[in-house]
Design a protein with these regions (language model features):
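Short, Lys/Arg-rich, polar N-terminal cytosolic tail immediately upstream
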Residues: 1-12
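Central cavity-lining transmembrane alpha-helices of secondary-active solute carriers
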Residues: 66-81
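Hydrophobic/small/kink-forming positions within alpha-helical transmembrane segments
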Residues: 73-77, 181-189
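A membrane-interface helix-boundary motif in multi-pass transporters
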Residues: 90-96, 189-208
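Cytoplasmic-side transmembrane-helix entry/capping segments in multi-pass membrane proteins
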Residues: 91-100, 121-123, 144-148
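C-terminal ends and interior cores of transmembrane alpha-helices
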Residues: 103-117, 217-221
């Protein structure tokens, strides 16, 4: 049971999270810029556009934004099922199993042509949802690795508390949240460059980033064991 505790802590480390957050920003830029202006992570934006087209009577365009929303819900459901069935595995942590599944799915997306954008966006949204459900803390602080508004609120709140209390631990918390936002922005910028130069296959860099997190978790587990 002690080994499980260390693994959970490692999944919350900033080093592990950094590559996952970069991957998340990349995925959002990729689907928006390369796959028909649909968001992989920002489901609020998809819901707004889905409703706008729906009320305008453009059913086909509305469905284009509804599908990733439904896929996102399915991804959360799938991640929780994996957690419940495999949380006591000894050799491979259940979070690492999810990362492997994400890598396989995103790698397949890189082969899909523009004509399959709806399916590609659904797969990427599914992967993003699995990440949201699986990696929910960094340095012990709850965060969203794919959406910035919650991190902006938490970071600014912590910064305000620091100005009143001068508690350095609270300052560290604020900087962690703003660091997450910065990493996401860098990932989005990287996604824009890759979409321009590698087109559909740019998503493969996201696979590489996730693979780094996967192996970091292995290395650190061996050090703690």
């Amino acid at each position: 049971m002690k080994l499980h505790k260390h693994r959970g802590q490692m999944s919350e480390s900033l080093l592990t999270a950094a590559f996952i957050i970069l991957s998340g920003g990349l995925q959002d830029a990729y689907t928006y810029l390369c796959r028909g202006k649909v968001f992989a992570n920002a489901q609020t934006g998809n819901i707004v556009l889905c409703s706008a087209y729906l009320f305008d009577g453009q059913w086909r365009h509305s469905a284009r934004y509804l599908i990733p929303v439904l896929s996102f819900l399915l991804g959360i459901f799938a991640a929780e099922c994996i957690h419940r069935h495999f949380k006591y595995m000894e050799k491979v942590h259940w979070r690492q199993m999810i990362i492997l599944a994400e890598i396989a799915l995103l790698f397949a997306v890189g082969f899909l042509p523009q004509e399959a954008n709806t399916f590609a966006n659904a797969v990427v949204s599914f992967v993003c949802a699995m990440q949201v459900q699986t990696f929910r803390k960094v340095r012990g602080h709850a965060y969203a690795r794919t959406m910035c508004i919650g991190n902006m609120r938490s970071g600014t709140e912590a910064l305000c508390v620091y100005f009143h209390t001068h508690d350095r631990e609270v300052l560290c918390k604020a900087l962690t949240y703003f660091g997450v936002i910065g990493l996401f922005a860098i990932g989005a910028g990287l996604g824009a460059l890759l979409s321009a130069h590698m087109a559909e296959r740019g998503i493969w860099v996201s696979c590489a980033l996730l693979a780094v997190s996967f192996f970091i978790m292995f290395i650190r587990e061996e050090e703690k064991a």
